[in-house]
């Protein structure tokens, strides 16, 4: 895990050969939807494991069949809310919840409009009550302009004040990270990699394309 010195609380996993191998497959234009979804699940699971290293633990006493001994409990793992940003984050959330299996789950449908305005439309919000003990994890694979996540954070914070707000993504652009940190300085961010820049259409370069379309197929207009 690498802390990026350009921002407070922003981390990437570019030092992990395993995560970089998964990311390489996700970037490859020849990777089909099934393998793409499986890759997102694997990333979510491994990144959740890494995030547990930042959670508070407590020592507990247990009894084995032979004697009493000390053990460890990851206390924060019992108080997690995962917010899934539809639709691309569904496989990522599936991986996260394999490790954070006590998590309550919220669903947000938010989509970004076209350049140059990139207006955000939020159609559906179902979020559980949030308490001061909770770590709120917002799953969204692509952190591009940051507009969607700013809007989601604005909405999620209406449901209660959390102990931590964490964004988990696959790729992020520096422009999006800066915008999110300016709007919500308290948020932490964990991504597989931080890419170079955005193009004129708001896509991350070198990126991996539209994560939702690659995972589930391109939608059609009727």
Curated annotation (Swiss-Prot):
* GO BP annotations, alphabetical order: UMP salvage; uracil salvage
Q: Which positions does UniProt annotate for uracil binding? A: 204, 209-211
Gene Ontology terms, MF aspect: GTP binding; magnesium ion binding; uracil phosphoribosyltransferase activity
Q: Could you give the cofactor binding note from the entry?
A: Binds 1 Mg(2+) ion per subunit. The magnesium is bound as Mg-PRPP.
Q: Which cofactor does it need?
A: Mg(2+)
Q: What class of enzyme is it?
A: transferase
Q: What is its EC number?
A: 2.4.2.9
Q: In which pathway does it act?
A: Pyrimidine metabolism; UMP biosynthesis via salvage pathway; UMP from uracil: step 1/1
Give the binding site residues for 5-phospho-alpha-D-ribose 1-diphosphate.
87, 112, 140-148, 210
Instruction: Name the InterPro entries on file.
Output: PRibTrfase_dom, PRTase-like, Upp_A, UPRTase/APRTase, Ura_phspho_trans
CDD domains, alphabetized: PRTases_typeI
Source species, domain of life: Archaea
How is it regulated at the activity level? Answer: Allosterically activated by GTP.
- Catalyses which reaction(s): UMP + diphosphate = 5-phospho-alpha-D-ribose 1-diphosphate + uracil
Keywords (alphabetical) are: Allosteric enzyme, Glycosyltransferase, GTP-binding, Magnesium, Nucleotide-binding, Transferase
Q: Which stretches are annotated as coiled coil?
A: none
Residues that, per the record, bind GTP: 38-42
Function of this protein? Catalyzes the conversion of uracil and 5-phospho-alpha-D-ribose 1-diphosphate (PRPP) to UMP and diphosphate.
Q: What family is it from?
A: Belongs to the UPRTase family.
Alphabetized PANTHER family for the sequence: ADENINE PHOSPHORIBOSYLTRANSFERASE, URACIL PHOSPHORIBOSYLTRANSFERASE, CHLOROPLASTIC
List the protein's name.
Uracil phosphoribosyltransferase
Its source organism is Thermococcus onnurineus (strain NA1)
Q: Which gene encodes it?
A: upp
């Amino acid at each position: 895990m690498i802390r990026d010195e350009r921002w407070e609380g922003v981390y990437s996993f570019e030092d992990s050969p395993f995560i970089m191998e998964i990311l390489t497959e996700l970037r490859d234009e020849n990777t089909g939807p099934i393998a793409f979804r499986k890759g997102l699940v694997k990333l979510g699971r491994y990144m959740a494991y890494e995030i547990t290293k930042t959670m508070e633990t407590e020592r507990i006493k247990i009894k084995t069949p032979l004697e009493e001994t000390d053990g460890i409990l990851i206390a924060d793992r019992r108080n997690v809310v995962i917010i899934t940003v539809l639709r691309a984050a569904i496989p990522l959330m599936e991986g996260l919840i394999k490790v954070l299996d006590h998590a309550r789950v919220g669903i947000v449908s938010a989509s970004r409009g076209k350049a140059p305005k990139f207006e955000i439309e939020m159609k559906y919000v179902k979020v559980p009550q949030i308490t001061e003990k909770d770590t709120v994890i917002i799953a969204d694979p692509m952190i591009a302009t940051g507009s969607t996540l700013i809007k989601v954070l604005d909405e999620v914070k209406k449901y209660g004040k959390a102990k931590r707000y964490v964004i988990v993504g696959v790729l992020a652009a520096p422009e999006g990270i800066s915008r999110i940190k300016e709007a919500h300085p308290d948020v932490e961010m964990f991504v597989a990699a931080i890419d170079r820049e955005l193009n004129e259409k708001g896509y991350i370069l070198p990126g991996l394309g539209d994560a939702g379309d690659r995972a589930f197929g391109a939608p059609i207009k009727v």
